[in-house]
């Protein structure tokens, strides 16, 4: 399964490890995903993966 937020579609990015000697090596920057249970309108619960920043926004709105 992809490392992607199911609500905002935030995914991984490509960056560099930079050493003190300014050597650069490729790395992946992964989103901070959390698995939460959410209740749908019909009463069923479903488990989804959400980024931590999205979870903060959801809690602020509630």
Swiss-Prot record:
What is one Gene Ontology biological process annotated in the Swiss-Prot or TrEMBL record? translation
Q: Which domain of life is it from?
A: Bacteria
Q: Which residues cross the membrane?
A: none
Q: Which Pfam families match?
A: Ribosomal_L28
Q: Does the keyword Hydrolase apply?
A: no
Record keywords: 4Fe-4S included? no
GO MF, one annotated term: structural constituent of ribosome
* Record key words, sorted: Ribonucleoprotein, Ribosomal protein
InterPro entries linked to this entry: Bacterial_rp_bL28, Ribosomal_bL28, Ribosomal_bL28/bL31-like_sf, Ribosomal_bL28_bact-type, Ribosomal_bL28_sf
Its cellular-component GO annotations read:
ribonucleoprotein complex; ribosome
HAMAP family named among the record's database cross-references:
Ribosomal_bL28
Task: Extract the NCBIfam families matched here.
Answer: L28
Family assignment?
Belongs to the bacterial ribosomal protein bL28 family.
**Record-given protein name:** Large ribosomal subunit protein bL28
Q: Which species is this UniProt entry from?
A: Helicobacter acinonychis (strain Sheeba)
Name of the gene this protein is made from: rpmB
